[in-house]
Amino acid sequence: MEKLILVKYAPEIFLKGLNRNKFEKRLRDNIGKKLEGIKIEFIHDSGRYFIKTNEINESIKRLSNVFGVSEVAVVDVVEIDMDSIKKSSLEKLIEAEGKTFKVSTNRANKNFEGNSTDISRDIGAYILSNYNDEMNVDVKTPDILINVEIRNKNAYVWSNKDITKGVAGLPYGMNGSTMLMLSGGIDSPVAGYLMAKRGVELNCVYYHSHPYTSERAKDKVKDLAKILASYTEKINLYVVPFTEIQMAILDKCREDELTIIMRRFMMRVACKIAEEKGIQSVTSGESIGQVASQTMEGLIVSNDCADRPVFRPLIAMDKTDIMDIARKIETYETSILPYEDCCTIFVPKHPKTKPRVDSIREEEKKLNIDELVRKAIDEMENIVY
């Protein structure tokens, strides 16, 4: 029996009205890129993508990480007649394990005789008559759900055991671009993932403080960028030398304002690279109140030097929720490796938690801001994943 991979869109794509075709086209393009190297045939049928391939397992593994895909399933392709549909449904039930079942039918082909409820009832009766072991119907919480779709050329049958959940969201690249300030911690990779899930193209900037931070710390961030790139088409990682900026701040500025001034330089560098690379926004992994620099006042002061939108998708999330997502997207184990990043050195004993914009601006007059930012960007390294 022929088998295809059914790719279901995330439900949100159906709500895009006149723009739906653009989202569908981008999703198909992204699927094609994700399955590069695998011989496939696309079949598009009214809100469904079917994929024909001999490499089903590898294809499903890749498809489950495509933003805009809610789920994928291996389906049996059967002729449009009740006998074939019934037999395939029974085979699917035998393959699965459970004591209760339900049949759900979608009669997309309105020329097919009967309605969806009657068809499901007939298939269920056939299963009960022909299944050897004890089996009961449960329409609310069945162990096995047999799905039947009857379309114009074929019918498709699969069970809930054949389904692999996707990441959903919107097709990658549909909603502009952002520069993620990527550290080696838990939060920023999750922030980047959530932005990419909303269709935002991801670029990353990492601030490296050699020799105070080791090459292992840099390697950790590179590994995090690779993991994020497994969900996207590609990622540019900009590695910015940050030691000279930090030393200048340490030498000339008040100790209790070191952290917030450092954060402002990070923001300036991210915005400047974004400007030069045509990137529309900046993204940070900050969460309100999580550390001393992430108070409301601290975030306001950080934003003061930004020349484009700054997104903080974790802003109201608890640390435990962030950690759960990190585990799910497989960045957690890398993030907790014990290598310090530039944010963990030169930390004042008593950082200011309620900085004022006018006070910080006055303190920054001691520094040659434009020269420090320009030199750091001129010496940065660009790595593509």
Swiss-Prot record:
The gene is thiI. One of its GO terms (molecular function) is tRNA-uracil-4 sulfurtransferase activity. Belongs to the ThiI family. Keywords: ATP-binding, Cytoplasm, Nucleotide-binding, RNA-binding, Thiamine biosynthesis, Transferase, tRNA-binding. Its EC number is 2.8.1.4. This is Probable tRNA sulfurtransferase. Pathway: Cofactor biosynthesis; thiamine diphosphate biosynthesis. It is found in: Cytoplasm. GO terms for biological process: thiamine biosynthetic process; thiamine diphosphate biosynthetic process; thiazole biosynthetic process; tRNA 4-thiouridine biosynthesis. Residues 57-161 form the THUMP domain. ATP binds at M181, L182, Y206, Y207, R263, G285, Q294. Catalyzes the ATP-dependent transfer of a sulfur to tRNA to produce 4-thiouridine in position 8 of tRNAs, which functions as a near-UV photosensor. Also catalyzes the transfer of sulfur to the sulfur carrier protein ThiS, forming ThiS-thiocarboxylate. This is a step in the synthesis of thiazole, in the thiamine biosynthesis pathway. The sulfur is donated as persulfide by IscS. SUPFAM superfamilies: Adenine nucleotide alpha hydrolases-like, THUMP domain-like. Transmembrane segments: none annotated. It is an enzyme of class 2 (transferase).
